[in-house]
Regions:
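Structural recognition of the beta-strand scaffold that forms the well-ordered cores
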Residues: 19-27, 66-73, 111-116, 149, ...
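Extracytoplasmic, non-cytosolic globular domains
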Residues: 155, 160-194
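Glycan-recognition surfaces
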Residues: 137-143, 187-279
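Solvent-exposed beta-hairpin/edge-strand motifs
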Residues: 316-332
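C-terminal beta-strand-rich structural cap/linker in extracellular carbohydrate-active enzymes
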Residues: 337-365
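Aromatic-lined carbohydrate-binding/catalytic grooves of carbohydrate-active enzymes
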Residues: 30-39, 46, 50-165
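N-terminal module-boundary/linker segments of secreted carbohydrate-active enzymes
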Residues: 2-44, 186, 284
Length: 365
């Protein structure tokens, strides 16, 4: 007999979305819950901010290299639903409405992401709230998904504050079903395992059947310590997560914080490179991800905070079966030559070297 999980829900993977990891811009780490548009109009959570960012992404080249989502995090809503129970944006901060904002973003060749919160506790005690205290969605699931689809939303991040982590195994799939019912293709980003992993090992197979991507660990903060804690957690738990990751299903280590306030140039390069591959741990780390053409993306990462270090990665270690390989530095945009058996490089403190290793075919003489 098939399980109820198999019968009740259409797999989110079947939506055909997120065949590569979604890329874009999200406001939270930089702007948080700044709702003071009267005194700080350029930095508050309002339509002006997201229209400005959409313009920058389209005009400054980000869209051309794959950054396509402009995503609104918490604090966009009014504190009250409409009389018929519909979510609505704060009218003072989004005077044109969310549909108009979606239309503007789409006109730039980009896509709109939005945030909601699911509450699964005793509603008489906890209420239904997002993490910042705005209306949650547990008692309006289909209505809210229909609202998002009607606005033209392309990506949904569903958070889990005020939720019992044990109930997420049924709560999040309820939203999956509601999204599928809308008929609109919407990428589904879940926070599901991030709330469960402190207590138990999440069921990643079930999560991957219902989500396009999922957060696994704490929120990132604007600090190097936060970045390294996420990297360590991923290194410690990669055997649990790697088997289910691939086109349509991705582990989400949270936002890039490059361009904010705390990271040095080398640390920014390190986060960028590591977020691209995420596949080991130690004081000198070697991360690798196989590519579809037989090459391997490799990141050499140094935890040293004082002097540069030489780090070597054997081809066997990174999953390359060839005897020889050509290396190309992705940050320097230059070829480094042919290497035999291993690749090595000098890595700056708290820095990375990121290369593509491409097998060289040795012809018989």
């Amino acid at each position: 007999m098939a399980s109820w999980q198999e019968n009740l829900f259409v797999k989110s993977l079947d939506n055909g979305l997120a065949l590569t990891p979604p890329m874009g811009w999200m406001d939270w780490e930089r702007f948080r819950c700044n709702t003071d548009c009267k005194n700080d109009p350029d930095n508050c959570i309002g339509e002006k901010l997201f229209m400005d960012m959409a313009s920058r992404m389209a005009e400054d080249g980000f869209k051309d290299v794959g950054y396509e989502y402009v995503s609104i995090d918490d604090c966009w809503m009014s504190h009250n639903r409409t009389a018929d129970g519909q979510l609505q944006p704060d009218p003072a901060r989004f005077p044109s409405g969310m549909k108009a904002l979606a239309d503007y973003i789409h006109s730039k060749g980009l896509k709109l992401g939005i945030y909601a919160g699911i509450a699964l506790e005793d509603l008489t005690y906890y209420g239904t709230k997002t993490c910042a205290g705005y209306p949650g969605t547990i008692d309006h699931i289909q209505q809210d998904m229909d609202t998002f689809a009607g606005w033209g939303v392309d990506y949904l991040k569903l958070d889990g504050c005020y939720s019992d982590p044990d109930k997420m195994d049924t709560g999040y799939p309820m939203v999956t079903k509601a999204l599928n019912n809308t008929g609109r293709p919407i990428v589904f980003s879940c926070s599901w395992p991030a709330y469960q992993s402190a207590k138990k090992t999440p069921n990643y197979t079930w999560i991957a059947e219902n989500c396009n991507l999922w957060r696994n660990y704490d929120d990132i903060q604007d600090s190097w310590q936060s970045v390294t804690s996420i990297v360590k957690w991923y290194g410690d738990h990669q055997d649990e997560m790697i088997p289910v990751a691939g086109p349509g299903n991705w582990n989400d280590p949270d936002m890039l914080i490059i361009g904010d306030f705390s990271l040095s140039f080398e640390q920014s390069k390190a986060q960028f490179a590591l977020w691209s591959v995420m596949a080991s741990e130690g004081n000198r780390e070697i991360w690798a991800r196989p590519l579809s053409n037989g090459s391997v993306a490799v990141v050499l990462f140094s935890h040293s905070e004082s002097t540069p270090e030489t780090i070597e990665a054997s081809f066997k270690m990174v999953g390359l079966s060839a005897e020889k390989a050509e290396a190309r530095d992705l940050f320097e945009h230059k070829d480094l030559g042919t290497f035999t058996g291993s690749f090595h490089a000098i890595v700056n403190p708290s820095g990375v070297v990121m290369v593509i290793l491409s097998p060289v075919t040795v012809l018989d003489v």
